[in-house]
Swiss-Prot record:
The keyword rRNA processing does not apply. Disulfide bonds: none annotated. One of its GO terms (cellular component) is mitochondrial inner membrane. This is Cytochrome b. The chain crosses the membrane at residues 34-54, 78-99, 114-134, 179-199, 227-247, 289-309, 321-341, 348-368. The main subunits of complex b-c1 are: cytochrome b, cytochrome c1 and the Rieske protein. It is found in: Mitochondrion inner membrane. One of its GO terms (molecular function) is ubiquinol-cytochrome-c reductase activity. Heme b b566 binds at residues 98, 197. It is a multi-pass membrane protein. Its main location: mitochondrion.
Length: 379
């Protein structure tokens, strides 16, 4: 009876097609688990954020104190806050693994799914950025001031747009209120985009480690992959809880323990660790407008991967040159993250400039490496 119900009920039929009887390639590896882990991260963030929003006050006089109130007076408020703060870091770790897997195995050939995924990456970054201002600490305040002020680099209308974002002539009460509003709203936009991402993925079918058409050898998602995903859920939740209990402030900034003060500038203004690679590219360009364009293009370059693809080559699994290119990209990412947290002085500034050129270079040379590999195979 249950079997017939899930196949006949209008709502359960959709769920059944998406999660139970979904045909999936037989050879998916553990790297395909990060998609479901991202869904879990989104649920954890929405639920913990919902309870935090019940006790938070989006007013400059009370924002910092309301966070202290959550930590000290609300039952298990400290757990909620640390889970939410470190959950964002785990979200980005899973997100970067998910993108890296897509690049390595050539998932960008599924163009609609890939492009919606890149839009999702921008939305997650935007959500995390507006949330960073909410504790109203020193680094939150100055980070938001510096990053939003970059919009003034837009010719003609830039300064006016900055004032519109701020709601005045500086980051103040209006800015905090609208950032809180956006931080509450954007996760629901994210959910809608995730459904679209899911929809397009099921239209084309999932990629697989071999990069070939897997229609001849598919298995149902449940029970083969559902239990595998559940194991990933338990491992990630265990790591998140353990990290939040033992090292709750390891990924935060000590400046945020000081209430925001517009008269005192921190020694080194920097965003959260998951933005540091893009921030390092921004700082490497002497021109303000050039830096902003480079910042945006450091992620927008992912949109161009389907167009840089050469037919006949898919992913890096069997292409030695593309494997070297991929691991060079990963090395650049980690080094840029390190440079983004260093002061703007020699030799860090010079290293950042070299790494910025390399970051864009590894994407631009991809078609030539594909052609070289095809030439070697034909030879």
């Amino acid at each position: 009876m249950l079997s017939s119900l899930r196949k006949s009920h209008p709502v359960l039929k959709i769920v059944n097609g998406a999660l139970v009887d979904l045909p999936v390639p037989v050879n998916l590896s553990v790297w395909w688990n990060f998609g479901s882990l991202l869904g879990l991260c989104l649920i954890v963030q929405v639920l913990s954020g919902l309870f935090l929003a019940m006790h938070y006050t989006s007013c400059v006089e009370m924002a910092f104190d309301s966070v202290v109130h959550i930590m000290r007076d609300v039952n298990y408020g400290w757990v909620l806050r640390y889970i939410h703060a470190n959950g964002a870091s785990f979200f980005f770790i899973c997100l970067y693994f998910h993108v890296a897997r897509g690049i390595y195995y050539g998932s960008y050939v599924l163009m609609e799914t890939w492009n919606i995924g890149v839009v999702l990456l921008f939305l997650v970054m935007g959500t995390a950025f507006v949330g960073y201002l909410l504790p109203w600490g020193q680094m939150s305040f100055w980070g938001a001031t510096v990053i939003t002020n970059l919009v003034s680099a837009i010719p003609y209308v830039g300064e006016m747009v900055v004032y519109w974002i701020w709601g005045g002539f500086s980051v103040d009460n209006a800015t905090l209120s609208r950032f809180f509003c956006f931080h509450f709203l954007l996760p629901f936009v994210l959910m809608a985009m995730v459904v679209m991402h899911f929809l397009f993925l099921h239209q084309t079918g999932s990629n697989n480690p071999l990069g070939i058409n897997g229609n001849l050898d598919k298995i149902p998602f449940h029970q083969y992959y559902s239990y595998k995903d559940l194991l990933g859920f338990f491992v990630m939740l265990l790591l998140l809880i353990e990290f939040s209990m033992l090292f709750p402030n390891a990924l935060g900034d000590s400046e945020n323990f000081i209430p925001a003060n517009s008269l005192v500038t921190p020694l080194h203004i920097k965003p959260e660790w998951y933005f540091l690679f893009a921030y390092a590219i921004l700082r490497s360009i002497p021109s303000k407008l050039g830096g902003v364009i480079s910042l945006v293009m450091s992620i927008c370059v992912l949109f161009f991967l389907p167009f840089l693809h050469i037919k006949g080559c898919r992913g890096c699994s069997y292409n030695v040159f593309m494997q070297l290119n991929f691991w060079l990209m990963i090395g650049c990412f980690f080094l840029l993250t390190w440079i983004g947290g260093c002061p703007v002085e020699y030799p860090y500034e010079f290293i950042g400039q070299v790494l910025s050129v390399m970051w864009f270079g590894v994407f631009l040379v991809r078609p030539f490496l594909d052609l070289l590999w095809l030439y070697i195979l034909d030879y």
